[in-house]
């Protein structure tokens, strides 16, 4: 007797449902051990008996028989699986079974018969809709579509009774989590009046309606509170709600609190379990602001200890001997009353002799006995005013300020003519005052000296003069003066207008009220800047009327009467001033170069709202003889930047660029002080009241609050001190340039929009759109193991956005995870084509305070470091020229955070060896593509051979199209949306 006969014998003896299920299980096992021909002969005979003999009538249409028919379909050569189910349907067998239709549809899916699949789905709807919910019917068919038809359902699952849902009470949304409170309310009966006995806005006595009824145990207030807690934190409802609960027991108050505390701890533990326990929670990177408290305390009792910048380890394994320096600066002010009275030319000569004697043997002299009392700490310094009043000043020198300061390095020659670094600075009083300054708090751990000098009164910091003793004498560098140095010349727009037309234009009605009124406020952005001169708002936005009024009184620096100081250095103004400076002959006047070969092109016609300013009205940004520091190779102040390099974040340069266009219409300027902003307080700006709710973000230069306007709109308010206008300008230009290229949707969805900007004399308020789902940094912290679908989706969108930013001739300059906002959830209806769709953007790039406008700075190169920890590109580290490389490196570092969930450190020492120490799991499909991007973006040979964004986008698109799985995509979307909800709940 065969194995099939042996298995069928018990069922033949006692036909029952249990026996049929046992027989079906044995047949499924034997089908894997026997050939199709052996199985076909024996099994068909058994099934034939079940269909014909009367004793099997009770089990003939049992769903266990479908298991036998499924095995028969595998061995059938004529009917196959689909034919068997068609015959069963004709005989009206299993027409009320959902499993029957699913198995039938599965056979259609295996044969890729989509139309027959739809017919089976229609039959299932027609036969089962009266007994089974439509969502339950379609759920199984949806899985089959994902498995056999790659998720291309089209309108297959459009419910025929969608219109009826409009009239249903509380129909709910698909895939919505069950509410614990709703389950509890469902158990409460409805009273005779037809109103709910329990819930909001009801007056029913809870105990009488819910608890004290015969044969019913209702919910207690403790259970209701616990259910609401679980709803708040996304917990699923308990299925054992029908069990007996001690609802009538009244607990004391402290027991209720203990219960709530246990529930809170349980929920928090569950959420913490979703985070990756092997990595730390990432925090936003920011620029260093002030030295830490421990280091400041150490310098209080030991003033000669070098500052933090001097001890910072080099990012590359390279040994350099720093040159010995003597620093002369006007940035720090600290002196005693004795220094003011006793510092004269004789003391200066004596100090000069000591300094010179120290240089002869290469060692600086010991100053511990002579000037130890003149040192001040980094945290507080004393400055003598003209009236002899001691003023305590907080040290606001930031680390990044030291990298981008107006510092000029002198060679062995002690005199050097310096150019005026305040081209746009308004006229100041020419009166001089004696200031005794101490320089012990500068970065270089070298001996310093105190010197008395005369200089004009200025609110802003003056020019730093750093004497490099290891530098070559100036005479030896005169050979290089014959080389043509790049001169920055700004070519005006093609349309030229007369000065009269210009003055009429600036009072055009399109300009918001408040412009061109005197105001005294410093304009800086999130980019660190030291030595920022005082600029009023009229000059900042290009008001030439005020400038022409005083054009005969240009600011000058008068050389001090001290003969010793004149030996070291002197400074004169670039502007001609007959009252102070001696007349200059025609032969000695420097000639301006012809701007036809300028390295800076003019703004094109689509730059935006421009002012009519002639080229002859815009002075050069820098002169050939002016050296400027924009950074350093290993973060030392004494690094020399060659002539011709410019600081892309220089305020003078930024003002000049903003003079070429009209101010944005959403900019409002006031000359009074900015109002104070505090959480849970109302703030009124320009007649509009903002209800400040809470602080949602804070950086080194600004705070961001969530607020509600009078029309109940939730907005984000960025409060920055001092006031900043560059970010408003660059966002306006970025959006206009995208719109000019036909990318209106990207400009709306992906670029930060400043709804209103209020610029006061002391601070600025930027009102932006509020996004509750957080940033990519919060997403990386909330995701334990992100699915590659979401990672590929986000990386591709980031690349598409940054590509268009660069195509608009703008460098963002500060690309990092916390500068990408998540604007919305991913729609679960999006399919395979969502990757490259213009309607599926979910990220927006923000924080444009460090952006660089390259349209008027065509073919320019920059040197120096930005100062953002872990986001300085290799070109900044090496001291090489860079442009868009800053964004390429920021993109690679951001991609590493999204993929691996942690910050990556820069490794390598030369071009070709640079990489990021990011660990991407081997099972990650994007592993090779990510490593390739890191290698190409970190090892860029020069500014003329930048990587192509299209190659990156194409690479990730090919992986997406080849490996895409509809079911995996939906699961990834669900996790992404859960992370968005978690970020929204944390705010």
Swiss-Prot record:
Binding site for ATP: 696-704, 718
Entry keyword set: ATP-binding, Cell cycle, Cell division, Centromere, Chromosome, Cytoplasm, Developmental protein, Kinase, Kinetochore, Meiosis, Mitosis, Nucleotide-binding, Nucleus, Serine/threonine-protein kinase, Transferase
EC number(s) given by UniProt: 2.7.11.1
Region (Disordered): 278-385, 574-599
Active site per database record: 814 (proton acceptor)
GO terms, molecular function: ATP binding; kinetochore binding; protein kinase activity; protein serine kinase activity; protein serine/threonine kinase activity
InterPro entries: Bub1/Mad3 (IPR015661), Kinase-like_dom_sf (IPR011009), Prot_kinase_dom (IPR000719), Protein_kinase_ATP_BS (IPR017441), Ser/Thr_kinase_AS (IPR008271)
Any one biological process term the GO annotation gives: mitotic spindle assembly checkpoint signaling
Result of knocking out the encoding gene: Embryonic lethal. RNAi-mediated knockdown in oocytes results in aberrant homologous chromosome segregation during meiosis due to severe pre-anaphase spindle defects characterized by disorganized microtubule bundles. Delays in the processes leading up to exit from mitosis including delayed activation of separase, which results in a delay in the separation of sister chromatids, delayed cytokinesis onset and delayed chromosome decondensation.
Domain Protein kinase: start-end pairs: 690-987
Function: Serine/threonine-protein kinase essential for spindle-assembly checkpoint signaling. Plays a key role in the recruitment of the checkpoint proteins bub-3, mdf-1 and mdf-2 to unattached kinetochores. mdf-1 recruitment is independent of bub-1 kinase activity. Has a role in the correct kinetochore localization of the spindly-like protein spdl-1. In addition, during meiotic anaphase I, controls the recruitment of hcp-1/2 and klp-19 to the ring-shaped domain formed between chromosomes. Involved in chromosome alignment, chromosome homolog segregation and spindle assembly.
Comp. bias intervals (Polar residues): 575-587
Protein name, per record: Mitotic checkpoint serine/threonine-protein kinase bub-1
Species annotation: Caenorhabditis elegans
PANTHER family membership: BUB1 KINASE, ISOFORM A-RELATED (PTHR14030:SF4), MITOTIC CHECKPOINT SERINE/THREONINE-PROTEIN KINASE BUB1 (PTHR14030)
SUBUNIT field: Interacts (via kinase domain) with mdf-1 (via coiled coil domain); the interaction recruits mdf-1 to unattached kinetochores during mitosis and between homologous chromosomes in early anaphase of meiosis I. May interact with bub-3; for localization at the kinetochore and the onset of anaphase.
Compositionally biased tracts (Low complexity): 368-380
Start-end of Basic and acidic residues biased regions: 350-364, 588-599
Any single GO CC term annotated in Swiss-Prot or TrEMBL for this entry: nucleus
């Amino acid at each position: 007797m065969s194995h099939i006969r042996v298995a069928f014998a018990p069922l033949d003896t006692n036909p029952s449902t249990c026996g049929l299920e046992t027989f079906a299980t044995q047949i499924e096992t034997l089908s894997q051990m026997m050939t199709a021909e052996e199985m076909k002969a024996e099994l068909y005979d058994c099934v034939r008996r079940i269909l014909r003999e009367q004793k099997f009538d009770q089990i003939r249409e049992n769903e266990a028989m479908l298991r036998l028919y499924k095995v028969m379909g595998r061995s059938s050569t004529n009917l196959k699986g689909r034919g068997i189910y068609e015959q069963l349907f004709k005989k009206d067998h299993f027409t009320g079974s959902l499993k029957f239709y699913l198995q039938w549809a599965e056979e259609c899916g295996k044969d890729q018969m989509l139309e027959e699949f739809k017919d089976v789905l229609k039959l299932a709807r027609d036969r089962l809709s009266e007994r089974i919910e439509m969502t339950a019917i379609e759920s199984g068919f949806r899985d089959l579509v994902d498995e056999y038809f790659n998720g291309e359902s089209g309108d297959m699952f459009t419910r025929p009774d969608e219109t009826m849902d409009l009239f249903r009470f509380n129909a709910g949304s698909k895939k919505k989590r069950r509410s614990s409170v709703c389950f509890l309310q469902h158990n409460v009966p409805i009273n005779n009046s037809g109103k709910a006995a329990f819930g909001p806005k009801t007056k029913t006595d809870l105990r009488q309606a819910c608890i004290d009824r015969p044969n019913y145990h209702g919910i207690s207030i403790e259970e209701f509170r616990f259910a609401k807690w679980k709803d708040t934190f996304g917990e699923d409802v308990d299925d054992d709600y029908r069990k007996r609960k001690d609802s009538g027991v009244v607990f004391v108050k402290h027991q209720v609190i203990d219960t709530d505390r246990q529930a809170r701890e349980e929920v928090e533990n569950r959420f913490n379990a979703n985070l990756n326990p092997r990595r730390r929670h990432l925090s936003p990177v920011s620029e260093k602001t002030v030295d830490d408290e421990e280091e400041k305390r150490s310098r209080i009792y030991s003033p000669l200890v070098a500052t933090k910048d001097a001890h910072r380890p080099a990012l590359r394994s390279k040994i350099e001997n720093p040159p010995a320096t003597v620093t002369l600066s006007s940035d720090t002010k600290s002196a005693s009353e004795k220094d003011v009275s006793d510092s004269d030319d004789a003391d200066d000569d004596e100090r000069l002799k000591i300094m010179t004697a120290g240089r002869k043997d290469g060692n600086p002299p010991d100053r511990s006995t002579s000037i130890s009392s003149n040192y001040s700490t980094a945290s507080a310094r004393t400055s003598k005013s003209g009236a002899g009043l001691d003023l305590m000043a907080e040290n606001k020198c930031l680390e990044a300020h030291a990298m981008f300061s107006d510092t000029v390095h002198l060679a062995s020659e002690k005199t050097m003519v310096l150019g005026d670094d305040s081209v746009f600075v308004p006229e100041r009083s020419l009166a001089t005052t004696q200031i005794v300054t101490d320089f012990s708090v500068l970065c270089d751990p070298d001996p310093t000296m105190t010197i008395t000098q005369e200089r004009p009164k200025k609110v802003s910091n003056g020019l730093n003069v750093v004497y490099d003793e290891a530098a070559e004498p100036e005479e030896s560098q005169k050979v290089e003066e014959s080389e043509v140095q790049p001169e920055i010349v700004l070519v005006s727009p093609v349309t030229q207008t007369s000065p009269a037309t210009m003055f009429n234009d600036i009072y055009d009605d399109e300009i918001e009220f408040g412009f061109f009124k005197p105001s005294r406020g410093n304009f800086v952005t999130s980019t660190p800047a030291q030595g920022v001169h005082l600029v009023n708002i009229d000059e900042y936005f290009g008001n030439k009327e005020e400038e022409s009024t005083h054009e005969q009184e240009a600011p000058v620096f008068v050389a001090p009467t001290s003969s010793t100081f004149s030996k070291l250095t002197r400074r004169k103004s670039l502007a001609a001033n007959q009252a102070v400076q001696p007349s200059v002959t025609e032969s000695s006047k420097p000639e301006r170069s012809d701007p036809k070969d300028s390295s800076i092109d003019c703004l094109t016609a689509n730059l935006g709202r421009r002012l009519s300013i002639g080229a002859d009205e815009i002075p050069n940004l820098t002169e050939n003889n002016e050296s400027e520091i924009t950074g350093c190779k290993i973060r030392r102040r004494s690094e020399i930047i060659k002539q011709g390099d410019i600081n892309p974040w220089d305020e003078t340069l930024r003002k000049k660029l903003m003079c070429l266009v009209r101010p944005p219409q959403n900019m409002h300027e006031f000359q009074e002080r900015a109002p104070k902003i505090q959480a849970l307080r109302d703030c009124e700006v320009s007649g509009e009241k903002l209800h400040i709710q809470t602080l949602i973000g804070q950086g080194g230069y600004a705070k961001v609050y969530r607020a509600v306007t009078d029309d109940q709109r939730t907005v984000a308010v960025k409060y920055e001190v001092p006031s900043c206008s560059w970010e408003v300008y660059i966002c306006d230009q970025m959006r206009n340039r995208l719109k000019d290229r036909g990318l209106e949707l990207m400009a709306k969805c992906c670029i930060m929009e400043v709804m209103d900007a209020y610029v006061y004399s002391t601070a600025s308020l930027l009102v932006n759109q509020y996004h509750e789902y957080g940033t990519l940094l919060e997403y990386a912290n909330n995701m334990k193991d992100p699915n590659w679908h979401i990672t590929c989706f986000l990386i591709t969108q980031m690349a598409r956005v940054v590509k268009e930013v660069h195509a608009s001739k703008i460098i963002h300059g500060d690309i990092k995870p916390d500068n990408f906002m998540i604007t919305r959830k991913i729609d679960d209806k999006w399919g395979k084509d969502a990757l490259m769709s213009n309607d599926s953007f979910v990220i927006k790039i923000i924080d444009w305070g460090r952006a660089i406008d390259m349209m008027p700075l065509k073919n320019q190169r920059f040197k120096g470091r930005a100062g953002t920890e872990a986001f300085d590109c290799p070109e900044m580290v090496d001291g090489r020229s860079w442009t868009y490389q800053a964004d390429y490196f920021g993109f690679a570092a951001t991609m590493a955070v999204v993929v691996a969930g942690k910050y990556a450190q820069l490794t390598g020492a030369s071009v070709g060896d640079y990489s990021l120490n990011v660990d991407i799991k081997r099972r990650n499909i994007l592993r090779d593509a990510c490593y390739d991007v890191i290698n190409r973006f970190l090892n860029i040979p020069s500014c003329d051979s930048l990587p192509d964004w299209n190659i990156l986008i194409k690479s990730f698109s090919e992986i997406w199209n080849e490996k895409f799985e509809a079911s995996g995509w939906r699961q990834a979307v669900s996790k992404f949306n859960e992370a968005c909800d978690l970020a929204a709940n944390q705010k």
